[in-house]
């Protein structure tokens, strides 16, 4: 019975060595793998992710509405300008938009609502995936609601600047003299909050896929900025990081709407200043093939 002891000890030693070797290999493998969780950017806002989940729509087909098969096509009406007029109009439009700046000092002077109606109507002419028009523009005029919006945003923005955004981002913003204090959310007579609808609903209650919803709404935002500039108003593009869910509840918006952008709108205050920034010349932004 005793002669088996050395054999058992040897077997146990071999087993222990094998376990440690495999443990070392496992650790080396983990070190070589990309650290997706550790390196995840803390400033990525879930509300800003495009949610055109086509696979989910296919799997849950009974919950989703099929699109219309037939849409009437009509003759297209078009203004064909002479070349000189085209050049003139394009140059004038460029000069108008080249004056657009991000203005953080906005007066409390009231803006005609008809103008706001028109600029949002203009934004609604944007193209969209399968003509789903996946946007909702919430116009806030009530001072109490504006102040609640400011409170929510400043609470989250302080955390963003102190923790989420990181040293590099905060350093890059120093030259623009921005911080988490957003006084313009109180002073601007109008706040426009632009929501993307990640899906829609048909009359029968079934869901409708909104293809490329974030790209579509982003195009609408660009047109809205141009329309505001054309009307003689100023704004600053604001993307309230991690504020979407709270603002959605405050404004009574449904869960399938996600906040994409907030625009304070009004006239510049008398003491308004902007950074003396230069835009890239054409040869740095255009490539002709």
UniProtKB/Swiss-Prot annotation:
Expressed at a high level in thyroid gland (at protein level). Expressed at a high level in thyroid gland and at lower level in kidney and trachea. 3-iodo-L-tyrosine binds at residues 130, 157, 161, 182. Changing residue 101 to A: Strongly reduces activity. Changing residue 101 to H: Reduces activity. GO terms for molecular function: FMN binding; iodotyrosine deiodinase activity; oxidoreductase activity. FMN binds at residues 100-104, 128-129, 237-239, 279. It catalyses: 2 iodide + L-tyrosine + 2 NADP(+) = 3,5-diiodo-L-tyrosine + 2 NADPH + H(+); iodide + L-tyrosine + NADP(+) = 3-iodo-L-tyrosine + NADPH; 3-iodo-L-tyrosine + iodide + NADP(+) = 3,5-diiodo-L-tyrosine + NADPH + H(+); L-tyrosine + chloride + NADP(+) = 3-chloro-L-tyrosine + NADPH. It is linked to Thyroid dyshormonogenesis 4: A disorder due to thyroid dyshormonogenesis, causing severe hypothyroidism, goiter, excessive levels of iodotyrosine in serum and urine, and variable mental deficits derived from unrecognized and untreated hypothyroidism. This is Iodotyrosine deiodinase 1. The lineage of its organism: Eukaryota, Metazoa, Chordata, Craniata, Vertebrata.
